[in-house]
UniProtKB/Swiss-Prot annotation:
Function as written in the Swiss-Prot or TrEMBL entry: Catalyzes the acyloin condensation reaction between C atoms 2 and 3 of pyruvate and glyceraldehyde 3-phosphate to yield 1-deoxy-D-xylulose-5-phosphate (DXP).
PANTHER family for this protein: 1-D-DEOXYXYLULOSE 5-PHOSPHATE SYNTHASE-RELATED, 1-DEOXY-D-XYLULOSE-5-PHOSPHATE SYNTHASE, CHLOROPLASTIC
Recorded name of the encoding gene: dxs
A Pfam family the protein falls into: Transketolase_C
Cofactor binding, per record: Binds 1 Mg(2+) ion per subunit. Binds 1 thiamine pyrophosphate per subunit.
Pathway(s) it belongs to: Metabolic intermediate biosynthesis; 1-deoxy-D-xylulose 5-phosphate biosynthesis; 1-deoxy-D-xylulose 5-phosphate from D-glyceraldehyde 3-phosphate and pyruvate: step 1/1
Cofactor(s) needed by this chain: Mg(2+); thiamine diphosphate
Reactions that this protein is recorded to catalyse: D-glyceraldehyde 3-phosphate + pyruvate + H(+) = 1-deoxy-D-xylulose 5-phosphate + CO2
This protein's name: 1-deoxy-D-xylulose-5-phosphate synthase
PROSITE patterns, alphabetized: TRANSKETOLASE_1, TRANSKETOLASE_2
EC number: 2.2.1.7
Keywords per UniProt: Isoprene biosynthesis, Magnesium, Metal-binding, Thiamine biosynthesis, Thiamine pyrophosphate, Transferase
GO cellular component, one term: cytosol
SUPFAM superfamilies, per database record: Thiamin diphosphate-binding fold (THDP-binding), TK C-terminal domain-like
């Protein structure tokens, strides 16, 4: 989309933060209004993360106005809220390409702009990185400032508190801003509290506070009295005791939509020494009523009509794999009150909304705490319950030690329902589910299943749920299922594949939902086709039979080729001293950027024609 300077006259003056800082402070509210309208206009035309960015407009403007970015280093946690940041840092005219193939990255990305200090996508990394950046800046001795912006969801993760605990110990000069959008602005966020925030962030208060500590450090009764008096005064309006105990100077909460107030507070805080903590209150979806009323639905949106405020309904195709999982969960819970379902803050995405409403006593959203989710599930299993951990492939990476140490070593019957496996699409490198088969396959006693359609997905969930000899995992992709008939639930024989087509010379061994593409390729090649179903344990007898009857084998999976299911087939053949040529087809050895799922698969060659051509070229 072309930029309309007449529609956004103030924003038109800002193509860099240097230009932003030339504006008179009085014009910043108008700039915020135009920036918010431009964000609505661009995202509604192109799709993307939406409600979070609407809530951080004033904060973004104030930060770039006060701090000398990119010299001063600004770090966004996760990055959903960083669209206004991208617009103000030279990417305004390309914002309509965000999340598209060849377009702007969906999150702050180091390779895209010098303003993007840390590449992000997963939550709760900003403070840890910020401490390292602040320590490096201090050694540089150029008065470079470090600011981290983290949301109220991301700060619940253990990593954020580990980082703050460390910051309180080594005391780097840095600012952590908590963007708290869980509630509307409360009554105590008004003129009095904004005035107090500026007072508490001012140099006079800081000097008196530190000076008083030094003067009275050797007079314990007076020091304790001063501490209690300070806590009493601040406690009337400041819910920051926890952050103070971690070693931060806490300021807030303040109105995150008062851009002029934010500018004043940030100016006061910029030169303070040691770790500072600013708590701001914002409203997710601010300035666009439909998003304010339903920020979860408007968190990430397709193209939509901003006038009506209604998002396009699903085209009515087949249900998603997430819904297939959610329906199975409800069906199982209706018969078994031992089922316990766990999600790390992904209720909607994992298809668990209906389950959470029907079976609230069996549903646990542990927030952004993947490590805790897995070990919590281990505890439930020890207690005689049957835990199901619903988690995205990319987020299970964050709990790898817990899978090994707390579940697998103890052979606890925990079922992992791994959503978003394989190519995810528009969220790019940080969200592709490329590695789960590789990092789970090496864990002893782990059963790993790869359904080829929704019926197999249900059967495998049922099989894993009733498997009591250790952990099991079922991985399925983002997107709609195929529309096959759903059969009555029954346990599958562990580690057994199914021959789908008999052919000559070449056998295709498929793992997962690429079976339709593999079927077309097998027909074109007159190849044998097998739905392997299990990555672990592999059907070794079937592999050896296929190797004995064919000149070559081809493995197909939507996982990294290195260490994936195909590698397991190679290992079986080598161990059995059966040196048959094997072609492993899967995800290449690089991080896959944003684009649609179809675009990514076409580029990689995971289409029917792509698979066929790869095999023909290899055999030639």
């Amino acid at each position: 989309m072309s930029f309309d300077t007449a529609k956004y006259p103030t924003l038109a003056l800002v193509d860099s933060t240097a230009e932003l800082r030339l504006l008179p402070k009085e014009s910043l509210p108008k700039l915020c209004d135009e920036l918010r309208r431009y964000l609505l206009d661009s995202v509604s035309r192109s799709s993307g993360h939406f409600a979070s960015g609407l809530g951080t407009v004033e904060l973004t403007v104030a930060l770039h106005y006060v701090y000398n970015t990119p010299f001063d280093q600004l770090i966004w946690d996760v990055g959903h809220q960083a669209y206004p940041h991208k617009i103000l840092t030279g990417r305004r005219d390309r914002i309509g390409t965000i999340r598209q193939k060849g377009g702007l990255h969906p999150f702050p990305w180091r390779g895209e702009s010098e303003y993007d200090v840390l590449s992000v996508g997963h939550s709760s990394t900003s403070i840890s990185a910020g401490i390292g950046i602040a320590v490096a800046a201090a050694r540089e001795e150029k008065n470079r400032r470090t600011v981290c912006v983290i949301g109220d969801g991301a700060i619940t993760a253990g990593m954020a508190f580990e980082a703050m605990n460390h910051a309180g110990d080594i005391r780097p000069d840095m600012l952590v801003i908590l963007n708290d959008n869980e509630m509307s602005i409360s009554e105590n966020v008004g003129a009095l509290n904004n005035h107090l925030a500026q007072l508490l962030s001012g140099k006079l208060y800081s000097t008196l506070r530190e000076g008083g500590k030094r003067v009275f450090s050797n007079v314990p009764p007076i020091k304790e009295l001063l501490k209690r008096t300070e806590e009493h005064i601040k406690g009337m309006v400041v819910p920051g005791t926890l952050f103070e105990e971690l070693g931060f100077n806490y300021i807030g909460p303040v109105d995150g939509h008062d851009v002029l107030g934010l500018v004043n507070t940030l100016k006061n805080m910029r030169d303070l020494k040691g770790p500072q903590f600013l708590h701001i209150m914002t409203k997710k979806g601010r300035g666009y009523e439909p998003a304010e009323k339903d920020p979860i639905t408007f968190h990430a949106v397709p193209k939509f009509d901003p006038e009506s405020g209604t998002l396009p309904k699903s085209s009515g195709g087949q249900p998603s794999y997430s819904k297939i999982f959610g329906d199975w969960l409800c069906e199982t819970a209706a018969k078994d009150d031992k089922l316990m379902a766990i999600t790390p803050a992904m209720r909607e995405g994992s298809g668990m909304v209906e389950f959470s409403r029907k079976y609230p006593a069996q549903y646990f959203d542990v927030a952004i705490a993947e490590q805790h989710a897995v070990t919590f599930a281990a505890g439930l299993a020890i207690g005689g319950y049957k835990p199901v951990v619903a988690i995205y492939s990319t987020f299970l990476q964050r709990a790898y030690d817990q899978v090994i140490h707390d579940v697998a070593i103890q052979k606890l019957p925990v079922l992992f329902a791994i959503d978003r496996a394989g190519i995810v699409g528009a969220d790019g490198q940080t969200h592709q589910g490329a590695f789960d088969l590789s990092y789970l396959r090496c864990i002893p006693d782990m059963v790993i299943m790869t359904p080829s359609d929704e019926n197999e997905c249900r059967q495998m969930l049922f099989t894993g749920y009733h498997y009591n000899d250790g952990p099991s995992a079922v991985r399925y992709p983002r997107g709609n299922a195929l529309g096959v008939t759903l059969e009555p639930l029954q346990k599958l024989p562990i580690g057994k594949g199914v021959v789908k087509r008999h052919g000559e010379k070449v056998a295709l061994l498929n793992f997962g939902t690429l079976l339709p593409e593999a079927t077309q390729a097998a027909e074109a090649l007159n190849a044998t086709l097998v739905d392997m179903r299990f990555v672990k344990p592999l059907d070794e007898a079937l592999i050896m039979e296929l190797a004995g009857r064919h000149e070559a084998l081809v493995t197909i999976e939507e996982n990294a080729v290195m260490g994936g299911a195909g590698s397991g087939v190679n290992e079986v053949l080598m161990a059995k001293r059966k040196p048959v040529p094997v072609l492993n087809i899967g995800l290449p050895d690089h991080f896959i950027p944003q684009g649609t799922q179809d675009e990514a698969r076409a580029e990689i060659g995971l289409t029917a024609s792509g698979i066929e051509q790869r095999v023909r070229d290899w055999l030639a």
